[in-house]
């Protein structure tokens, strides 16, 4: 855990870490010395010259004051380090996530990222002071007391150090017993959280399927798994706690027994023996503190591991190049591109060149690789081999900001943020001129929606755009994409779930866009591609036909068959007679 935490400390604060370590060690030594000073203090107080106790009291007072000053400075430095870790972690995760390879975002990793982001709050800022400082103090103080006791009585000091070894051995063993179960419990907790979120978001479908009872859904399975993991965790923790408690009793008996033996033999006076009772309490207190900190320690270790997992997530290749013709519609070239999802080959040697400013439609059956082509152009994925070029520049060598600025995307399932309709359009270009925003909304026919909405473009659309219909959300996403001054526009199945009116609105918006762009449209419904200059028909990861719509229809190949199937499907209606 400490190694992970040190990796999160900013470079400019590494010197402060050394200062913090020195102050923490000094604090431990001062507390150990203060505890052991009670022995000569009481010995002097019960001696023939009790006035000698003033000297030892003075030393005890000085050590106590020095400890207060040290602890105050340690706390200040600890908070400074904690806030530095918090700030760096927040910035690093914010910088990392937009560049992480999309293949990393599995359900488990997505849950890890969500929990890591949620953890970057006040608890991370207070980690050093509230957990690390007490933990280091509790771990070192018994050993420091044992070393200090060597100067009073070597056998007593050795007994104390032996007790430290026994207690830390028991603590390590109990931690090992529970760590594996704790990992499983953490995984099942994450899975249960994801299922609860899924259960809440899919209520409409679940109610329609009469599966609203959690026990009949995957929530029930996740809950059962969480319950079982929790029981296993408790089962593994109890033996560890018993073992640690027994070790504490052994250390107590060993230390107290040594003190009694030395007193009986006359090697230790009665006043010193009485003082040792107080020292014994100070000796055992840290172990109780460690036991109390153990759950927080495991939780913090898991949190830091999640944060580190996000920061270690694989990122897309990034270069420093930029497009030479900024703002001009670029050419797009695929040069023998291959891509796979695991063992499944999606694109197998795809090559083509799209002319600047043209509109190209990519058509083909489901699973043929159409959306993957768009992802590669957008830089969301990287080819396993081959190259994707914009104006002759390999996408992988582009600066990440230049790559993102070059492409605007309309997704099949658009996501709107919990803000106003206008705010969601402005995501495309937050600094856009108001006239440009109005023009983009007019092109996407968002202006037709404003009269029906309670607050016009100031209407709050809700998380995910739940206040709008699917077609309305798609229009807003089109306006957002058109507002972005990107020279490449990618459209992925934007009309697949829309009615005829909304489909016409989307197609008209894409056609009427006056900005010079190279457009690539993926579509199943062929009405969406009627204005395309060129069609690529993709099947089984290969481009099997390439040409203008009329040429491909006349050729009578796969595109013509696909077109005929679409035409037949569009004419089907309930009550149609089979021929």
From Swiss-Prot:
The chain crosses the membrane at residues 26-46, 49-69, 127-147, 148-168, 242-262, 273-293. Part of the ABC transporter complex IrtAB involved in the import of iron-bound mycobactin (Fe-MBT) and carboxymycobactin (Fe-cMBT). Has a preference for Fe-MBT over Fe-cMBT. Transmembrane domains (TMD) form a pore in the membrane and the ATP-binding domain (NBD) is responsible for energy generation. Belongs to the ABC transporter superfamily. Siderophore-Fe(3+) uptake transporter (SIUT) (TC 3.A.1.21) family. Residues 21-299 form the ABC transmembrane type-1 domain. This is Mycobactin import ATP-binding/permease protein IrtB. One of its GO terms (molecular function) is ATP binding. Forms a heterodimer with IrtA. Its EC number is 7.2.2.-. Signal peptide: none annotated. In IrtB the ATP-binding domain (NBD) and the transmembrane domain (TMD) are fused. The IrtAB transporter assumes an inward-facing conformation, which may represent the low-affinity state after mycobactin release towards the SID and the cytoplasm. Residues 1-25, 70-126, 169-241, 294-579 are cytoplasmic. It comes from Mycolicibacterium thermoresistibile (strain ATCC 19527 / DSM 44167 / CIP 105390 / JCM 6362 / NCTC 10409 / 316). Residues 47-48, 263-272 are periplasmic. It is an enzyme of class 7 (translocase).
